[in-house]
Amino acid sequence: MAPTPLPLEQMSGVGGYLPAGQEGGPRINTMSMSMLIDFIIQRTYHELTVLAELLPRKTDMERKIEIYNYAARTRHLFTRLNALVKWGNSVSKVDKSSQIMSFLDKQNMLFVETADMLARMSRETLVRARLPNFHIPAAVEVLTTGTYNRLPTCIRERIVPADAITPAEKKQTLLRLNQVIQHRLVTGKLLPQMREFRIKNGRVTFEVKHEFSVALTVMGDSQNVPWRLLDIDVLVEDKETGDGKSLVHPLQVNYIHQLIQARLVENPNALSEVYNCLHYFCQSLQLEVLYTQTLRLNYERLDDNNITVEEYVPGVKLTVSYWRDLKSELGYRLTVQSDPSEIGRPLAVVHVPSLGAKESAEVADRAVRSEHLSMERLIVHTVYIRSVSRLSDLKLEFQAFLKDVDFNLQGTPAILTVPVLSPCLRAEQIHITIDTHTGMFRCHVPKHLDCPITDEMQEALNGDRSKLPSLLSELRYWITHRRCEKTLQHLPATATDTLTFLTQPEQELLQQGRHKIYVKLHRHPNIILVVQLKEKSTMANEMEYTFHLGFVAFQKDEADVIDDSAKQLVSVVAQPPSDIPKFFTKLMRLIEFDTFVATHGPGTEVDAEVSPHKRKSTGDILAPPAKQQKTIFPAYFIPELAHVVAMCDEKIPFMNLAQTLSKHNIPHSGLQVEANATSLVLKILALPQPGKSATAAGQQPQQGAASAAGTAPPSGSSAFPRIEPHVWDDLMRRVLSISVRSQTNKNSQVRIWVVEFVFYSTPLQSCHPKEQGSRRTVYLTYEQANHDFSKTVEELLNDWSKIVYLYTLVYDFAEQLRNKRLALCDMLVVKSYSYMNLLLGYGPKKEVSCNIYWSVQSHGFRLTFVGGMSAVNAHSMMRDQLAQHLNQQHSLTQIAQILHETYNPMSSIAKLPVLPFLGIPRPQVPVLSFCMLAQSPCLMRLTYQAVYCLELRFRANRLVSIRDGASSRFERNVIEEFTPIQGLKAFLSKYVDESAAYRGRAPHEDDNPLSPIGMEDNYGGPSSVTGVSAGGSSPFLGAGMRGPQSPRDSGLRFPAPHTPPSSSNPHTPASPHPSAGGGGAAQSHGNFNLTSPPAPHMPHPSPGGLMPSSPLNPQPSPHMVHSPGPNTLYMQSHQDSPFTAMSPANNQWPGSPSMPRPSPRPGQSPEHKSTGGSVVTGGPDRGGSRGTLNRPWAGAVPTLLTHEALETLCRPSPHPNKDINVTDMSPLERFLGCVYMRRQLHRNIQNEESLTALNSTEPGVVLFKVDGLQCQVMLNQMHMQTLHLKITQLPPPPDKPTFQLSPDDLLVIEQYFDTRVAAPPYRPNSLHSICRLLNLPAQVLKDFVQIMRLELKPEFGGDQLKWTVQMCMRMPPSAVPIVPSGNACVVLGRMKILFFLQITKIPFNGKDWKDSPSLVLPIVYDITMNLTQMAERREQVPSPMMTAASTLLRRFSEFNSQQNQCSLFPAITDLLTNLQLATDMPQPPPNQAIGPPVGVGVGVGVGIGVVGSSPNPMMPMQQLQPQVGPQGQVGPGGYPQLGPNPGGPQ
């Protein structure tokens, strides 16, 4: 607002007058804007500073009010300033007018003021104008001389003070006055009480302690000048109730001052008069203070029964009585009084009954004649002296019947301590004191405040003192009981005074009384220790202890009969638990200990007493000195009791164990004390042989136990190793000693048995540094907490069986290890052999380990495998199978060879991933990628995603046979849980090494029959496993064919041939004899050791002539029959497949047709021929014929691979297609993934009505067509690890022209399928998405192809794109949850297409891709309306970036002018070009997380290249507009009308 002009009267200048030169200046009362702003800022800052200083002193509400007022004022002020500044912008024109008006106003005011001033001068000033009369002489004097001497004298005297005396004169006067005072004191009469004085500064100060202080002086040096009283200070104080205030009022002091000053005039003994007056006043004041304190003490803290004021005469005496409860004739009282004989003496204290003069004077000095005047201190000190006197009399009475006892009387208040025992802690002594209020005796024992005897003793002290000796004896026994409890506090025992006897025992010791205690041993509930207590006759304060060991039993009532076995340490017959608890105790036997023997045995100190008059002998020189340092125990600790309890607790378990060993017929040497008395030991002389250790204690033969446990071996073998006599003798010679000791576990504080076996060396030398000596020890531990000693002995025998059984293996293995022909030292190394465990190291660097030990629970050997620093131990997968083989063969040599020969293939198999994956069969069901199932030590099954199964058999000569595990090895049908792997034979044939198949055959072996250790042996080791003959049989040799039962013949299918043998490899040359039907390809199974026909005496038909539908004999005839296959998926493209016809062999195999047979599909090509009729007559065919390798059953025939080939097959390696940038996978996983994807594609074609399956003449090729396109999916025949799509454009019908895709578009689809759909990880839902895209109209598919091209080649987008795009084939978890995660995310329905795009911000300025934000956008394209927009959920709040993308797509659809073309790709291009990233983008909701690209093959920079090449280069971005086939409006949006979409969401 504009400033308000002031009236003229308030303007500057005299009456508004302006000085000359300012008439033309600016108007009055104006100010510059800068100065105004400075003033406002200064005012605001000043108010803020004041506010900050004052606010902390105010309340919270006041602070809020002040802050609000300050904010309102400041806001109002700056609002006015803002309005003024805005107004000032347009004030230029007003300024000129203002200056003119200002000049005119100044001129006007100048005339008006001039007239007013002239009128005022003429009317007021000039009327009274006169010249004054000046004082000329005074002015001249002041101006000339600078002084004024004409002031009157009366004024000078009243105003100007007189001159003061000098300090020297003052000091001289005070010294003279001190001399006068000293002379007056010397010549006068001075009382003795006033001899303490000091003269200083002309005054003398007298001080009487605890009474007063007075200062005097004289006014002259004449003897007649009286003393002048200057100051009086009363020194009497009441520090307890006065609160530091003066006890005398100033008026009282003034009155005394005047009184004494009046008596000093003309008084010859003036100083004596001063003392008498003040002394009487101070003594009266002291008595008044003591009386007041007594009344207050009686009123506030004590009562009339404690202290009472009997008489009080002010200024004379005060009498107080105390201890009124005591029946004293005279009573106890004290009197504080002044001395009547001599008035100058201080207050005196008189005691009744009288105290000594020394004690009475001490009391007075402490309480009255001190600075602290206190009646309480007077009474307390009096009571203390009285207490010491009474306690001294009591001490004399105690000394009469307690001899040689040290009594102690000390402390404040006084305490008399009486020792009860010797030695005795001070806390265990009787503390006797006197109650200060009542004067009664009080006694207690500080350590035992709950002692019931102290009350009786206190009554005896205050009454009949003849009972004190008996009460002291009772207290002595009671404290001894507590000492016993304290001693046993940290021992496994509990002390009690009584036991719950149903009938009182007859022994005199156990009768009622307090002179014994019962000690219950925690670890031995049936044993008690009775401790008898006695006082020594020579020294009553010392105790004697006698120990008795009692055996007790528990009963519930009198009718409960106790067996005599309770008298023994270990009950022979275990008593069953009773429903009724047994509370009562019955003593069975009582044994008295010799206390001296029990406390002076091994483990105790040596008592050496040497007579002082006896000379030391020569033998005593080596003995320890007589004054050896004794162990100092606390007084409450009873070493004899602790030693006996510890001895019982330690020896009773040994006695129980020894009795149990005797019951098990195990000889021992009894309990002994080791050398140097270190511990107790129980020596076992011998242990029985494990197979003969069954006793009458309830043990069963271990063979039966093995059968009961379900681990009984097959017939023909023994469950336990046979212990040869020479092996047992050798072990017995090596056992040096077996010792049993008892120790305490440091961690759990539980007592355990430690059994020490000492052996002499071992038959098997190890490389462990601690196992190089000839003395070997084995320590076994057992718990003692269960009190079951039979169980402990059984556990000892079980551990002994572990040693013996492992020794039987090691004894034979040591001999074979020393045999250099077996070369076992090159296979493994013995890391450790501790008689309980055998640790073998094997592998290339001998870093993986196998631990072998005997398990009592499973009644057999167990194996545990541990990996090394740089390798894992893959044998853990077949741990149970190896253990079963060892328990059947009992040969460590075979185990060593198996471990050595199977290490490499098992390590290769262990490299396969076993992680669970989601989204394989169903999105929420996890499935293992690979699962290893060991069948036997040399037979392993691998399952892939619970669909496919591979059977691996480890052979000799570093060979492995692999076959399809879906084909049964016992029957001719297919296992229901698995699916045959199509193309497995052809894939494995690429890794076959032909030279390795012949390495196992030496030239001289042609004339000799095969050994059971051939390539077809089950284990490829020195021997085969008994009872696993089924592993060597073939599913294609008839239902009656079973392997031999002999453990050495499981690998031989036929008797020894008379023809030269050949390799069992199916790729070796066939024998000259032809197969039945002329179509055999000489395919032999893994269990055929030779290729010649079997002997004619075989109990079953020949596989060459009596198996018309066997997979080993493929028939070229179109009418051949075959057993039903595992799945019809692989046979639908073969018109002459044997699975499409009825099998005539059902009468031979009634259970074989386990799956339905599909009917022949129509439209099969008549040119389709069978490929199984070729006959191999030449040399070895590496892969067999093409038709044979591609047959569905070809994988059931084993294929031999080397260990190196298996390592290549299982080791992760880069993808063959360099354009697919994924994690390294093994070739086997890629092959199985492609086969699985091809199988899922075949099933998808059958389930989708929009896809039409076509017949293919090539095996393993999926051929189908969609609208206008024919698609062919096949494996890459070079490596069979990738799937490829080949699309062919079908010619359009002549009557209906359709939109045609260019060859470049088809190439993009093929490249996208190869790098994004059929790439790892292999997910079938990606196939669903691509199939639904192929089923779209050609115009829409063209735009999707453009998006695929932009994803494959981001550089074709040019520099204008700010985002990269990837099309999602599966639903990512970070997208809006429209479709379940993992499902196919391309959904068709109601002429609309829902798909998901992931866009990623292109980094600029050198940023990394990982820092770029990414979005997953759900896009909906409406085919009918030609509209592209985002799919949104109403119940969810979208993120700002999703909202921005939706706005861009909506704006593009509104302003899109090209209605004759598909809007999908242009809308996506516009979105990638114009979508801006908000700098402060908030966090997205949980279901729309911003992160890196999801899925496989959708990452930025992943798969930039393409598969193959096109003759024409891809079109640039300017040419990516789709070409619309028909011109003109055919349907809405320029598209032909389409029917209902058959490919809706599944």
From Swiss-Prot:
UniProt KW Repeat keyword = yes
Alphabetized InterPro entries for the sequence: Med14_C (IPR056877), Med14_N (IPR055122), Med14_RM2 (IPR055113), Med14_RM6 (IPR055114), Med14_RM8 (IPR055107), Mediator_Med14 (IPR013947), RM3_Med14 (IPR056879), RM5_Med14 (IPR056878)
Start and end residues of each stretch annotated as Disordered? 692-717, 1000-1193, 1512-1546
Tree of life domain: Eukaryota
CC terms in the record's Gene Ontology section: core mediator complex; mediator complex
Give start-end ranges for motif LXXLL motif 1. Answer: 51-55
User: Which keywords does the record carry?
Assistant: Activator, Nucleus, Repeat, Transcription, Transcription regulation
**GO MF term list:** transcription coregulator activity
Regions of biased composition (Polar residues) lie at 1125-1149
UniProt short sequence motif LXXLL motif 2, positions renumbered to this chain: 468-472
UniProt feature, compositional bias: Low complexity: 693-717, 1020-1035, 1061-1075, 1515-1527
Read off the PANTHER family from this record: MEDIATOR COMPLEX SUBUNIT (PTHR12809), MEDIATOR OF RNA POLYMERASE II TRANSCRIPTION SUBUNIT 14 (PTHR12809:SF2)
Assembly description? Component of the Mediator complex.
Tell me, in a sentence or two, what this protein's role is. Component of the Mediator complex, a coactivator involved in the regulated transcription of nearly all RNA polymerase II-dependent genes. Mediator functions as a bridge to convey information from gene-specific regulatory proteins to the basal RNA polymerase II transcription machinery. Mediator is recruited to promoters by direct interactions with regulatory proteins and serves as a scaffold for the assembly of a functional preinitiation complex with RNA polymerase II and the general transcription factors.
Q: Which family does it belong to?
A: Belongs to the Mediator complex subunit 14 family.
Tell me what this protein is called. Mediator of RNA polymerase II transcription subunit 14
The organism's lineage? Eukaryota, Metazoa, Ecdysozoa, Arthropoda, Hexapoda
